[in-house]
Amino acid sequence: KASSIGVILEGVILIFILTLVIIGKQISSDFVILNATPIEWIILLTWLVGLYLIYKNPTLKNSKLLKEEKKLPAISKKKAHTALLIFTFCAIIVLISGVLLEMSSEEISNRFHISGVIFGATILAAVTSLPEISTGIASAKLKDYQMAVSDIIGGNAFLPVLLLVGSIISGTSIIKSIGPTDIYFTCLAILLTGIYLVGLIVKSKHQYLRLGYDSFAILMVYVLGLLGLLYIVK
């Protein structure tokens, strides 16, 4: 299972970063650095420090996974370069697809008179999660569960860093334009991450459909969170 100290550390860092987003919204200072507020730079610093702590985590160096990797045959440079090219190509495709999804989702929500918030929180969120789903399935087949979990948590931790990039490019601080719905989803993400971390520490002795109590709790809280979104939209 992926219940290692490294994954728990990733979850804690994610909670730190999401909390900083909420704090940044509440601070009404006009002081900016390269069009970005200090809190946006602190988010970047927190993310970088988190990467360093994960890299230096001693449990990762002695993990069973690394011991098994040492037994694997060496990969030729040609195969490694080919894999790198494929990885880069797929990353570019995902980037272009993200732009097209944003454009098409706005058109669909306007045409069918669907709230942009509702559409983005459900359909668009599910579609943009397809890379994580496919990566998770592939990692599960390889029995590399830690990679599957780290992909999800790491991706969520990196996204707030893009607030800094967006602020620098657009010329105005994006974190100041965050609305109540964004704060709501940020709090929901913190709550879900907290439940997940509890599930990693406190193991479920009983499972149903190969899912523990923590998984059902996460699903229930997420559904209730979406229902609560309806009251915010109103």
Model-based region annotation:
Residues 1-234:
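Hydrophobic alpha-helical segments, chiefly the membrane-spanning helices
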